[in-house]
């Protein structure tokens, strides 16, 4: 595999003058920024949609079909709940046109324009964002479906999207996905300082390898346009050692005009915190990694109409935490050498788990195995899981 990836990486296709750059909008760039920097849209002071087409694409990523009456009715209900919360609980006074007159769908455009209405639209949309997320979590608890069924629905959705992305010109040279096995999940929790199952975000993981570093940005654009709601990226959980988005934008005259708005967003909505590098990764391991709550429609999964009583209060969309890893071919090869390798990662993780579990045995007078038996072998050599 690695020889093939290296050959692909040396082809040099998809350079900075790729004609696809003309398709990038400021909405795309700000969404990509949120993916790779793990920000929270609650800190944003505006949106960046230019027209109804961009808005409708964003809604479809959230599993809202602008052509379906029940979906737009659900959007209106969320707006009504948001305004009620803001005025009743927080004492806000939302302008009538934002609270009622403007279609809820168009609030995304209003929040992208200048003027007083933008602030009101942003406030309402932020609460709608939270309400929809909470509703999706509540709906999961009411469903008579297994986690396996929902995971399978996510896998099918991502697989379809990746095929579409390839058809759109994305040079994805390798794609794989996995679910964390029970033993791996237990090991991860025992190794983590905060060993809470809710904090394990990679139960479902998708990994893509592109032919070049620049191609990663094109892949990210397609993801935010087709699959990943940038507003449901988990804040503070993104890691990016590869993509220099500002540099990517600055190198191209077509994109350079968007740089001031990107820098303004960086000032207003700074990163939530410095990402914590995985302590078990090798010293030069590089990756673009983020976690998002992916929306999945369950009315179709259950073969029920959107107006079914089951969906009356919480809609028909649930969310599934999903991890994405994206690297270019050359980096993928470097990540498998020496200390960066997956085998090395697992060795360090296993050693930590065994050391934590055996901690205190000596103080209690118990006989401690050689080297705390950290290796799983009696001769002290490192063993692989």
What are these regions (language model features)?
Residues 1-92, 108-141, 157, 214-385:
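An acidic, glycine-/histidine-flanked metal-binding catalytic module
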Residues 92-125, 129-194:
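Surface-exposed, low-hydrophobicity interaction/linker segments
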Residues 149, 153, 195, 203, ...:
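Charged, alpha-helix-enriched surfaces in structured cytosolic catalytic cores
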Residues 154, 158, 201-202, 206:
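Extended, gly/pro-poor, charged amphipathic helical "stalk/hinge" elements that serve as dimerization
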Residues 190-201, 279-281, 313-315:
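Short, flexible, solvent-exposed loop/turn segments with mixed acidic/basic and small polar residues
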């Amino acid at each position: 595999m690695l020889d093939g990836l290296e050959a692909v990486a040396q082809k040099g296709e998809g350079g900075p003058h790729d004609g696809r750059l003309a398709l990038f909008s400021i909405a795309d760039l700000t969404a990509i920024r949120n993916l790779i920097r793990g920000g929270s849209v609650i800190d944003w002071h505006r949106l960046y949609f230019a027209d109804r087409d961009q808005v409708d694409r964003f809604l479809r990523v959230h599993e809202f079909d602008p052509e379906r009456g029940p979906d737009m009715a659900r959007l209106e209900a969320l707006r009504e709940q948001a305004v009620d919360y803001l005025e009743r609980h927080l004492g806000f006074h939302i302008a009538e046109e934002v609270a009622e007159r403007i279609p809820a769908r168009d609030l995304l455009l209003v929040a992208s324009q200048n003027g007083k209405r933008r602030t009101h639209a942003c406030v309402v949309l932020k609460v709608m964002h939270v309400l929809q997320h909470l509703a999706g979590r509540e709906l999961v608890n009411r469903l008579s479906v297994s986690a396996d069924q929902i995971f399978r629905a996510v896998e099918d959705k991502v697989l379809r999207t990746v095929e579409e992305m390839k058809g759109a010109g994305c040079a994805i040279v390798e794609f794989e996905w996995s679910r964390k096995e029970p033993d791996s999940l237990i090991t991860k929790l025992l190794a983590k300082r905060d060993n809470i199952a809710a904090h394990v975000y990679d139960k479902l993981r998708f990994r893509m390898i592109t032919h070049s570093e620049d191609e990663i940005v094109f892949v990210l654009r397609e993801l935010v346009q087709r699959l990943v709601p940038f507003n449901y990226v988990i804040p503070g959980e993104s890691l990016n050692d590869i993509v220099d988005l500002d540099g990517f934008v600055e190198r191209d005259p077509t994109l350079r005009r968007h740089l001031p708005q990107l820098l303004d967003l960086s000032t207003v909505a700074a990163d939530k915190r410095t990402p914590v590098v995985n302590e078990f990764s090798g010293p030069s391991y590089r990756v673009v990694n983020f976690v998002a709550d992916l929306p999945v429609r369950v009315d179709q999964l259950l073969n029920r109409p959107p107006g079914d009583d089951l969906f009356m209060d919480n809609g028909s969309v649930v969310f599934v935490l999903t991890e994405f890893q994206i690297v270019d071919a050359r980096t993928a090869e470097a990540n498998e050498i020496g200390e960066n390798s997956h085998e090395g990662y697992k060795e360090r993780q296993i050693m930590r788990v065994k050391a934590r579990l055996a901690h205190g045995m000596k103080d209690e007078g118990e006989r401690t195995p050689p080297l705390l038996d950290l290796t799983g072998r009696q001769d002290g050599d490192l063993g692989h899981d």
